[in-house]
């Protein structure tokens, strides 16, 4: 089955009050038009044509690297005029026409429209909605056949009562478009060339009109302002949350959970409120994610606990490990089985060995820490000399006392102990105690200063 796709994306979207085109507003961290393109790409069309207009360079940059032909509509003269600009770039086959600001349209709905529309038919996707205000109405004759689509600005009082609306999504052969598009006239209030006029031409030419409907009403909702954008964001997120819960994951409040990428989940996980997923994230079984956590491009293995207000980015947290609360795991970390990254601990480009613990107030950067180590409160691996980063290596079973600074590059041997408050600048041999601090003195003649008082 041959198929071409036309996506109309020339609109300015003035109600957005934005410096970028409407189709480049984001929903779930993807632009509106990227959502649409992703849905149609799954149909494996022969070509995709995007009709641009306002700030066309921005739209082209956003879709760079995809197999798309861009066509510029210099004057905004309506949807019929927009499709006419794309006509020379279409193959002699079925053409699917849709909009770049309808982000939740599913591949399944589009596929049904294409599959049920014969080569000599006109396929129209319509929907029944409770509030059709602002939308084009589907007018039918007494036999139920579609006769025309009337835009609200051109509709009479009776037509405005109609609940069946035009979604603006069509499937029609290029040969019919070549005949009909030049015949469209701007005989309307807006003085624009409406694509909806092809319904009238189809009736006149005795072309069958195939009508299909979406699975869910939200799939055909467009975005014209930021209020509608926020509303569709919640619809999208709720839909994603329900799919995740169906896989065996408990979400404390689906209305306070955001996926801005892809989430692969195991079973019996628990996700608390205000958790944000970014990029590609994988959760194992029995994972617990506390409130207000952000997970980005990471792997969380079985039985891990990510406590509240923690961030994990570009890292792997191994089975049974604990992160947080208030912890930050930056890219290229590997937190091994049963290890602990505790409260107010930051780690970057660090391996924390199996069973090792950094429980509080610590910075671990460019570090390789062995198994069963204890990293005390306030420990800092000083990895930056002002120009280059250097590595700290800590052997198995080492004990690093609180408030110690390890000046990289430095090696702490297996089983070594660093006394609290030390500044370590040289390698520490295995099983040695290293202390580097001033000797404690008691000055019995010292007197505390007394606050002066005005006389």
UniProtKB/Swiss-Prot annotation:
EC code(s) of this entry: 2.7.7.23, 2.3.1.157
Keyword Metal-binding: yes
Subcellular location: Cytoplasm
Keywords: Acyltransferase, Cell shape, Cell wall biogenesis/degradation, Cytoplasm, Magnesium, Metal-binding, Multifunctional enzyme, Nucleotidyltransferase, Peptidoglycan synthesis, Repeat, Transferase
Residues that coordinate or bind acetyl-CoA: 377, 383-384, 402, 420, 437
Cofactor entry: Mg(2+)
GO cellular component: cytoplasm; membrane
GO MF annotation terms: glucosamine-1-phosphate N-acetyltransferase activity; magnesium ion binding; UDP-N-acetylglucosamine diphosphorylase activity
Gene3D superfamilies hit by this protein: Hexapeptide repeat proteins, Spore Coat Polysaccharide Biosynthesis Protein SpsA, Chain A
Cofactor: binding details: Binds 1 Mg(2+) ion per subunit.
First-level EC class: transferase
Positions that bind UDP-N-acetyl-alpha-D-glucosamine: 8-11, 22, 73, 78-79, 99-101, 136, 151, 166, 224, 330, 348, 363, 374
Ranges for region N-acetyltransferase: 248-455
Primary location group: cytoplasm
GO biological process, alphabetically ordered: cell morphogenesis; cell wall organization; lipid A biosynthetic process; peptidoglycan biosynthetic process; regulation of cell shape; UDP-N-acetylglucosamine biosynthetic process
Matches recorded under PROSITE patterns: HEXAPEP_TRANSFERASES (PS00101)
Catalytic residues in the record: 360
Pathway(s) per entry: Nucleotide-sugar biosynthesis; UDP-N-acetyl-alpha-D-glucosamine biosynthesis; N-acetyl-alpha-D-glucosamine 1-phosphate from alpha-D-glucosamine 6-phosphate (route II): step 2/2; Nucleotide-sugar biosynthesis; UDP-N-acetyl-alpha-D-glucosamine biosynthesis; UDP-N-acetyl-alpha-D-glucosamine from N-acetyl-alpha-D-glucosamine 1-phosphate: step 1/1; Bacterial outer membrane biogenesis; LPS lipid A biosynthesis
Binding site for Mg(2+): 101, 224
HAMAP family per record: GlmU
Family the entry assigns: In the N-terminal section; belongs to the N-acetylglucosamine-1-phosphate uridyltransferase family.
Summary of the function given for this chain in its UniProt record: Catalyzes the last two sequential reactions in the de novo biosynthetic pathway for UDP-N-acetylglucosamine (UDP-GlcNAc). The C-terminal domain catalyzes the transfer of acetyl group from acetyl coenzyme A to glucosamine-1-phosphate (GlcN-1-P) to produce N-acetylglucosamine-1-phosphate (GlcNAc-1-P), which is converted into UDP-GlcNAc by the transfer of uridine 5-monophosphate (from uridine 5-triphosphate), a reaction catalyzed by the N-terminal domain.
Subunit record text: Homotrimer.
Protein name: Bifunctional protein GlmU
Species: Francisella tularensis subsp. holarctica (strain OSU18)
Lineage summary: Bacteria, Pseudomonadati, Pseudomonadota, Gammaproteobacteria, Thiotrichales
């Amino acid at each position: 089955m041959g198929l071409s796709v036309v996506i109309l994306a020339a609109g300015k979207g003035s109600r957005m009050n934005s410096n970028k085109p409407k189709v480049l507003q984001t929903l779930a961290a993807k632009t509106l038009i990227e959502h649409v393109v992703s849905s149609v790409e799954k149909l494996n069309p022969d070509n995709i044509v995007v009709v641009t207009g306002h700030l066309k360079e921005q739209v082209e940059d956003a879709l760079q690297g995809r197999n798309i032909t861009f066509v510029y509509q210099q004057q905004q003269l309506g949807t019929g005029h927009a499709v006419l600009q794309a006509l020379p770039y279409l193959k002699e086959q079925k053409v699917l026409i849709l909009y770049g600001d309808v982000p939740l349209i599913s591949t399944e709905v589009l596929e049904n429209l294409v599959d049920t529309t014969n080569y000599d038919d006109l396929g129209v996707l319509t929907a029944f909605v409770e509030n059709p205000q602002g939308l084009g109405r589907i007018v039918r004759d007494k036999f139920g056949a579609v006769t025309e689509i009337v835009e609200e600005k051109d509709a009479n009082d009776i037509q405005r009562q109609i609940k069946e609306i035009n979604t603006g999504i069509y499937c029609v052969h290029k040969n019919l478009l070549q005949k009909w598009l030049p015949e469209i006239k701007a005989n309307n209030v807006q003085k624009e060339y409406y694509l909806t006029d092809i319904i009238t031409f189809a009736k006149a030419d005795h072309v069958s009109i195939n009508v299909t409907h979406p699975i869910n009403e939200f799939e055909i909702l467009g975005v014209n302002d930021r209020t509608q954008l926020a509303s569709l964001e919640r619809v999208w997120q709720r839909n994603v949350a329900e799919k995740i819960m169906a896989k065996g994951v408990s979400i404390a409040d689906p209305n306070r959970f955001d996926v801005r990428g892809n989430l692969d989940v195991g079973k019996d996980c628990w996700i608390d409120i205000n958790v944000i997923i970014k990029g590609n994230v994988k959760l194992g079984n029995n994972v617990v994610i506390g409130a207000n956590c952000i997970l980005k491009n990471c792997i969380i293995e079985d039985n891990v606990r990510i406590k509240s207000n923690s961030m994990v980015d570009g890292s792997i947290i191994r089975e049974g490990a604990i992160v947080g609360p208030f912890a930050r795991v930056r890219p290229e970390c590997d937190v091994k089985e049963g290890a602990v990254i505790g409260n107010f601990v930051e780690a970057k480009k660090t391996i924390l060995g199996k069973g090792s613990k950094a429980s509080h107030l610590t910075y671990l950067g460019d570090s390789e820490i062995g198994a069963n180590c204890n990293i005390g409160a306030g420990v800092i691996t000083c990895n930056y000399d002002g120009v280059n980063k250097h590595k700290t290596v800590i052997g198995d079973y080492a004990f690093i006392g609180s408030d110690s600074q390890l000046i990289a590059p430095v090696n702490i041997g297996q089983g070594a102990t660093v006394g609290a408050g030390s500044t370590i600048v040289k390698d520490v041999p295995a099983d040695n105690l290293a202390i580097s601090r001033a000797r404690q003195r008691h000055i019995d003649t010292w007197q505390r200063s007394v606050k002066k008082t005005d006389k």
